[in-house]
């Protein structure tokens, strides 16, 4: 669920998902278009694409179990959808951590008008 993804982001990056990622670049937050602006934005388009593959799952609201062991997230047992959603969120949260060095506060609330390039496909 988005609540768990938000928690993973905080645990991985030390930043709250809102406001630091909810409106970042062209792809973080709801929807997206154009080209990703940097590594952080690329994490978000990859996450969007991961969710797109789970067409029969309720990606935003399905609750899943996970734990943090030795600094790594482990997705718990659950339905196929719950496990896949957890994996999408886990990979994205870890990607956001790896991208912290290139995070730019100037892209934190990025105007849609700057996302006009042709959109990337999954």
From Swiss-Prot:
What Enzyme Commission number does this protein have?
3.1.1.4
Q: Cofactor comment in the record?
A: Binds 1 Ca(2+) ion.
Principal location class: secreted
Name the active site residues. Answer: 47, 89
Database matches in SMART domains? PA2c
CDD domains in UniProt: PLA2c (cd00125)
Q: Which cofactor does it need?
A: Ca(2+)
Q: Name one GO molecular function term.
A: toxin activity
- Top-level taxonomic group: Eukaryota
Q: Which GO terms describe its biological process?
A: arachidonate secretion; lipid catabolic process; negative regulation of T cell proliferation; phospholipid metabolic process
Protein name, please? Answer: Basic phospholipase A2 Cdr-13
The species is Crotalus durissus ruruima
